[in-house]
Amino acid sequence: MMSESNKQQAVNKLTEIVANFTAMISTRMPDDVVDKLKQLKDAETSSMGKIIYHTMFDNMQKAIDLNRPACQDTGEIMFFVKVGSRFPLLGELQSILKQAVEEATIKAPLRHNAVEIFDEVNTGKNTGSGVPWVTWDIVPDGDDAEIEVYMAGGGCTLPGRSKVLMPSEGYEGVVKFVFENISTLAVNACPPVLVGVGIATSVETAAVLSRKAILRPIGSRHPNPKAAELELRLEEGLNRLGIGPQGLTGNSSVMGVHIESAARHPSTIGVAVSTGCWAHRRGTLLVHADLTFENLSHTRSAL
């Protein structure tokens, strides 16, 4: 058992770690996003597309040089936490994450993006009722905490949709739903976008899964071979739309398509789509029981 003074020191230390990490990912793209954008840039053949990709990389470099957010919309901060039941600060983690967001808002700085519903007042701290949003997965007997930070920008959040299909619509209905949403809405989401598809029973379970899907490293595949094949076929088909970087036409519309799924009710197919923009700001931090940590998503950047 920690003494109260030692626990407070540990709380302060972890708060600082998470705050620094959150501020850092506002200025730097994760390794896989940079690599994918470079791949798309090298493959682009349209003159306008080449100019847009050049501007994107110039923007990313200036963000690093000036230590300023890569996009002025630093989003609403969300955390997806996979934590062991024996992690020493499990009981304090919710408040740690909230305090870390408030500190990162000043350090980065982050744009103020938390508006209280009905009052329509911006809190000015990026925290508020239910914000930061935290999704929990508890691992029995584990003592590490894997903290995924996601900055949900307005533009890339707007195309999000969820629907419950009749089972007779089948996977063809899922594909139709994805294409209808991306073809009509992704143009305003700062493409090329990363597409997350959730398939489950209801709108809420599918929606959470679709968000988790865009947290996976780009190009990772669903463990079910049939789902993995559908990911690839959707990616190929969506790229044929020719939306291109920033919606100005080009070879690629998406950085990738990821599917997350859960067993469904026999009478329903819940499907949801979430998108991440080209400036896909998310990061994965692995914190051990002794509060040493590993930056899993930004191996080329030091905290």
Swiss-Prot record:
Reactions accelerated catalytically: (2R,3R)-tartrate = oxaloacetate + H2O
Upregulating conditions: Induced by tartrate, via TtdR.
Enzyme Commission number(s): 4.2.1.32
Membrane-traversing stretches: none
Any GO molecular function: metal ion binding
Family to which this protein belongs: Belongs to the class-I fumarase family.
NCBIfam families, A to Z: PRK08230.1, ttdA_fumA_fumB
Protein name: L(+)-tartrate dehydratase subunit alpha
The species this protein was found in: Escherichia coli O157:H7
